[in-house]
Design a protein with these regions (language model features):
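A short, charged helix-loop
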Residues: 74-107
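Short secondary-structure transition/capping segments
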Residues: 30-39, 78-89, 173-181
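Acidic, glycine- and histidine-enriched catalytic cores of nucleic acid- and nucleotide-handling enzymes
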Residues: 47-87
Length: 229
């Protein structure tokens, strides 16, 4: 119960177009579904009344090699053609943390500190929704990018932090406090915590990744925001 299943059926190219009206009622008592139009595939996201969810795709058999290369977690359960018997073992390799380039590192740091000033502005103006929107959608996400790179570097970029960064709390204390945004005081504290985490992280992270960043700009921005909070 409460399981998510991702299943793809591959059909011959000539019959693939007919599956646009594929009968999906056989899978169970459906609560709601979402149909995603995608190139060279039919895709239905289905939530059933028993709590299970099925993401079902139907694709032409000609795309199997590209499909398998796209995500190393894919595995073949049944192959009626016999063409795909010598596959490598499944792994989450395609989801591992990737080493950042200098440009990606620069962009993340700049975005984090630049948008932190928007959050501060919202707090000082008493605009909670404005402040929270920028904190949740950008500031916290960019902090998570930095934290993820730290984990990647420490593990030789050989693991995934999971969907929605779900494994981050196992590596860093204080993550949960970044979600206490019910009032301006909470948002201010969350912003302060995020700034502290970033400032504590950046010197060692940049050194270990052999990347650079504008230290003076980071220090000026951090000092300005913390004095205003």
């Amino acid at each position: 119960q409460y399981q998510d299943f991702d299943i793809t059926y591959f059909v011959s190219d000539d019959v693939f177009p007919t599956f646009e009206v594929f009968d999906r009622s056989r899978f169970g008592d459906m609560m709601i579904q979402q149909i995603l139009p995608e190139k060279n595939r039919w895709c239905w996201l289905m939530q059933f009344m028993d709590g299970n969810r099925l993401d079902l795709k139907i694709q032409p058999v000609s795309v199997v090699p590209d499909y398998l290369a796209e995500d190393t977690l894919n595995t073949i359960l049944l192959d009626k053609t016999g063409h795909y018997t010598n596959l490598t073992a499944t792994s989450d390799r395609t989801h591992w943390v990737q080493r950042p380039t200098q440009s990606e590192f620069d962009d993340s740091i700049t975005e984090f500190f630049w948008v932190s000033t928007y959050v501060l502005k919202g707090i000082l103006r008493g605009e909670l929704l404005y402040a929270n929107t920028f904190f949740e959608s950008i500031v916290r996400e960019e902090l998570y990018r930095l934290l993820t790179w730290r984990i990647g570097r420490d593990t030789d970029f050989s693991l995934s932090v999971g969907k929605a960064h779900k494994r981050l709390p196992a590596y860093f204390e204080g993550i949960e406090s970044l979600y206490d945004l019910s009032d301006l005081t909470g948002t201010g504290q969350a912003l302060s915590t995020a700034l502290k985490m970033a400032n504590d992280l950046l010197p060692s992270l940049s050194h270990d990744l052999q990347l650079t960043y504008d230290v003076a700009s980071v220090e000026r921005t951090t000092d300005y925001i913390l004095r205003q909070l």
